[in-house]
UniProtKB/Swiss-Prot annotation:
One of its GO terms (molecular function) is metal ion binding. Heme binds at residues 14, 17-18. It comes from the Bacteria. This is Green heme protein. Keywords: Heme, Iron, Metal-binding.
């Protein structure tokens, strides 16, 4: 089984659209890990990326680790 390169997914599909400032702004919408997962899923669906659940999970984990630090 291949490891998922969550950073590549973010670089190719997320920060190219809105940049990383949305993760660090004071008035960000996402205020929990569940909300972050939902936001990643919504973006994935809006962009018609057809990611697998494990890709959504990997991107959520990466964004949480790098920017949000919500408790699991």
């Amino acid at each position: 089984e291949e490891a998922i390169d969550a950073q590549a997914l973010v670089d190719q599909n997320c920060t190219g659209c809105h940049g990383s400032e949305v993760y660090t702004r004071d008035e960000r919408r996402v205020e929990s890990l569940d909300a972050l997962h939902g936001q990643v899923r919504m973006c994935e669906q809006n962009l018609e990326l057809t990611w697998f659940d494990d890709q959504v999970d990997a991107v959520t984990t990466l964004l949480n680790r790098e920017y949000y630090n919500f408790e699991p």
